[in-house]
Amino acid sequence: MAAKVLLVEDDRALREALSDTLLLGGHEFVAVDSAEAALPVLAREAFSLVISDVNMPGMDGHQLLGLIRTRYPHLPVLLMTAYGAVDRAVEAMRQGAADYLVKPFEARALLDLVARHALGQLPGSEEDGPVALEPASRQLLELAARVARSDSTVLISGESGTGKEVLANYIHQQSPRAGKPFIAINCAAIPDNMLEATLFGHEKGSFTGAIAAQPGKFELADGGTILLDEISEMPLGLQAKLLRVLQEREVERVGARKPINLDIRVLATTNRDLAAEVAAGRFREDLYYRLSVFPLAWRPLRERPADILPLAERLLRKHSRKMNLGAVALGPEAAQCLVRHAWPGNVRELDNAIQRALILQQGGLIQPADLCLTAPIGMPLAAPVPVPMPAMPPATPPSVEIPSPAAGQDASGALGDDLRRREFQVIIDTLRTERGRRKEAAERLGISPRTLRYKLAQMRDAGMDVEAYLYAI
């Protein structure tokens, strides 16, 4: 289900970044550069939410809020304010603002507020947590809930697509820090020369293009939890700096001389065997032991047969809502195919299969052919290859030692991460060459401007501060 949002922001770069975020979230929007320009748009179109900056030339966000409250009393308004102006934002909520965001903020924080105020959805519900009907999954979830109550560092291992970030978010939600930020940063998706400034922040003038100081992800997560996703992809040089942050619980921005104290909980994920990476010299041994205080191994989907259908039903509900479909159900034969499939791509592959089936199904009942599990769309469908069901695990809690990854997993995972990182680097380099001009950059890349906007939104969703590091050396 999509919201229709009116975005009011005078800063062009930020307006484009917010537009990209709304686009990635699947929402409709109209973006204007002033409160004065917003008024005629409001008069001719219906919106489910207004997102407005506070400090703008001419009519500011507070004045716009007052007019909207008078003319459109049921239209929620979300205000964006600078770090030092929180008091005024709180006062605006007393005057009728639905909520506020303090800059800089994560894309997920914006999308959560859009879902809450425009669509009436509460983020972090049961529909977002781990599915654990398999006995081994339930036991692992119990361990996760127990360690959540402490501040211990947790290392979550598992194949790509198993839902490691979902488990990490569950640990955060079960912890005393649940009401504080949860910041996830994908170490595999960000080019090496941008990762340090993304994690630790930078001061004004610390490199070419650093026109203003920016806090890093560690600072943004202060008081809450930071997730270092795919930590095994972090360069060795940066691993030493991360080790110091974990030991001292303080961070130094790039170009700064004074450290900043942190109150933070650290979680990390990996799809590799970190012990083997240490032995091969690709990962620091001291950092490995600092991270693996409490290791958890999230099993691949093929070893969690009891979780497959509940996951499929959840994904069916989720994507049915997004596609504005009526009631759609899994047919018994389709359900059997799902349980028998090997799922080399894990939950991510299951998600894709459900989306395909919703597009292809007719009459509200998904059949095996709609899933396209064993052949590309348009090719004859072969019978699914059955996999042997694993034996029932013992009643005692499972070991939390990190298992070796499945054969072939490292190569495919590393290849995918490397290709994504190279793609992002090519996009950044092309934008530098074109001095930030998106239309020209898209032409040089051979893609449409809309595709470029989507790629930039993906980069921001992976934790990259595109604007801040566009001209970084």
UniProtKB/Swiss-Prot annotation:
Q: Where is the Sigma-54 factor interaction domain?
A: 130-359
How far does the signal peptide extend, from start to end residue?
Answer: none
Per the record, residues carrying 4-aspartylphosphate are D53
Look up the record and report any one GO term of the cellular component aspect.
protein-DNA complex
Q: Which CDD domains match?
A: AAA
Q: Which Pfam families match?
A: HTH_8 (PF02954), Response_reg (PF00072), Sigma54_activat (PF00158)
**Which keywords does UniProt give here?**
ATP-binding, DNA-binding, Nucleotide-binding, Phosphoprotein, Transcription, Transcription regulation, Two-component regulatory system
Q: Name one GO biological process term.
A: positive regulation of cell adhesion
InterPro entries per the record? AAA+_ATPase (IPR003593), CheY-like_superfamily (IPR011006), Homeodomain-like_sf (IPR009057), HTH_Fis (IPR002197), P-loop_NTPase (IPR027417), Sig_transdc_resp-reg_receiver (IPR001789), Sigma_54_int (IPR002078), Sigma_54_int_dom_ATP-bd_1 (IPR025662)
Q: Where is the Response regulatory domain?
A: 4-118
The phenotype of cells or organisms lacking this gene is: Deletion leads to loss of motility due to the absence of flagella as well as swimming defect. In addition, mutant possessing pili adheres poorly to mucins.
PROSITE patterns from the UniProt entry: RESPONSE_REGULATORY, SIGMA54_INTERACT_1, SIGMA54_INTERACT_2, SIGMA54_INTERACT_3, SIGMA54_INTERACT_4
Cite the GO molecular-function annotations of the record.
ATP binding; ATP hydrolysis activity; cis-regulatory region sequence-specific DNA binding; DNA-binding transcription activator activity
Coiled-coil stretches: none
Q: Which residues bind ATP?
A: 158-165, 221-230
What this protein is reported to do is described as:
Member of the two-component regulatory system FleS/FleR that regulates the expression of multiple genes involved in flagellar synthesis, adhesion, swarming, motility and antibiotic resistance. May function as a transcriptional activator by direct binding to a cis-acting sequence upstream of the target genes.
Its recorded name reads Response regulator protein FleR
Whichever gene encodes this chain, its name is fleR
